[in-house]
Amino acid sequence: MGLFTVTKKATTPFDGQKPGTSGLRKKVTVFQQPHYLQNFVQSTFNALPVDQVRGATIVVSGDGRYFSKDAVQIITKMAAANGVRRVWVGQNSLMSTPAVSAVIRERVGADGSKATGAFILTASHNPGGPKEDFGIKYNMGNGGPAPESVTDKIFSNTTTISEYLISEDLPDVDISVVGVTSFSGPEGPFDVDVFDSSVDYIKLMKTIFDFEAIKKLLTSPKFTFCYDALHGVAGAYAKHIFVEELGADESSLLNCVPKEDFGGGHPDPNLTYAKELVERMGLGKSSSNVEPPEFGAAADGDADRNMILGKRFFVTPSDSVAIIAANAVQSIPYFASGLKGVARSMPTSAALDVVAKNLNLKFFEVPTGWKFFGNLMDAGMCSICGEESFGTGSDHIREKDGIWAVLAWLSIIAFKNKDNLGGDKLVTVEDIVRQHWATYGRHYYTRYDYENVDAGAAKELMANLVSMQSSLSDVNKLVKEIRSDVSEVVAADEFEYKDPVDGSVSKHQGIRYLFGDGSRLVFRLSGTGSVGATIRVYIEQYERDSSKTGRDSQDALAPLVDVALKLSKMQEYTGRSAPTVIT
């Protein structure tokens, strides 16, 4: 094959190419504008140390959403022009975000090469399709998202960019076929290695979990199982892991064929969007006579999030991470020698705090964004972490990992039933959660999401909540006028985090109202939507009395919900009488 050449293309900056907590997310039509994607990719190459680009190996893959295949070809041509030596691509451009992290950390090429980073093409749980969302983010050599020092540099570069490099005469690579395609350029050879990433990922999972113990559970006639990939990239792993490795019936897989538009659905694993799974698990509105499975789980578009369900029972993500942490040492071989520490994002309930205190574990509360966990893990300070937004993970990689969370839960259920598979009744998901509440108390918890709110109105609402914090006596007067049956507000602030590893400070990470009985109200503007603003309200109440841990969550939280919505003047500012999603 002849030499490919390098072309310098003149360009001008686009406004708003600032990567949020999980990269740059915009509508597909925005990314399809001439030079838009190219500007961001070149700005990223220019922000990285030279040795992480020239002669390096990078991964380019994602959740398979619409525009991914075009983007892979564009980025590959730009990588060649910028002196990258090898590009690793998941077959059909498919690679889950956790698998990308695992590949960066674990995979060794046939020539001994290791990846220094990755362009991940995903907008996670946002919808896909020609008129929906696309996203791109860069992960570093530790397998985790680029830190703010790098993303700030990328954004700065996008504001001044005047040219980018591309090898337009490099042919498109057939990414549907596994194998290495080699080219020659001005600086020597350039290879594109298309591979099935599920092989590397499964190999890693087998070093963490006891697959034989899980298989005994999944093949027991008493245990029934259902996994919903919501037509996201998790489907590319589900059959290999749950059916071929662990013996589940193929009929237990729902929506496990990855689709560019996620089947027209919203690939967000919650009670609103995972409708089919929710119905099957007996939590829907229709009354079916079919007995639900014992265990159900769902993934989002890029397979880093998870939802865990029992028969007619929802496990909150905040409870999920606490229960995994409480049971990890005895249930999961990877943690047999103990946990280094645990961490949660600030809006996540304090259920994990109580476990950490009881088990005498190091505990960290961090801002929203997985990179904060990554720092702690790189420093050997944290083993298990989670966030209320359906993200759970451990230090095996530097991303949250939806399939890992499912395998963790299956490991716990298998351990609790190891002497019981021949008995009359299994210890169920609900049993495990209720046992946990009896031991540690229950954190009643809910989240209200107001999506696509006018950005100006959202900012005004948040500013008002901050200004009110200057006088707690005034706040308490208002609170008592709204509801006399809630505790007193004892502290209120904007959450600020000083990273114990690198000393960096993250300000304005959410507005908190803390009550004397351990209850909390938290308000945040989310950075992951592509249009308008999303206001998230987190409402939490701690109940230590085990005789009171069985109440309906929304009933238990009704007084605090009333306070949250009236104190913030939610309807007044947003015009919304109800949230878009309640979790």
Swiss-Prot record:
Cofactors named for this entry: Mg(2+)
Example GO molecular function term? Answer: magnesium ion binding
Co-factor binding details: Binds 1 Mg(2+) ion per subunit.
PTMs per UniProt:
Autophosphorylated.
Which Gene Ontology terms of cellular component type are present?
A: cytosol
Q: Which family does it belong to?
A: Belongs to the phosphohexose mutase family.
Q: How does it assemble?
A: Monomer.
Q: What is the designated name of this protein?
A: Phosphoglucomutase, cytoplasmic 1
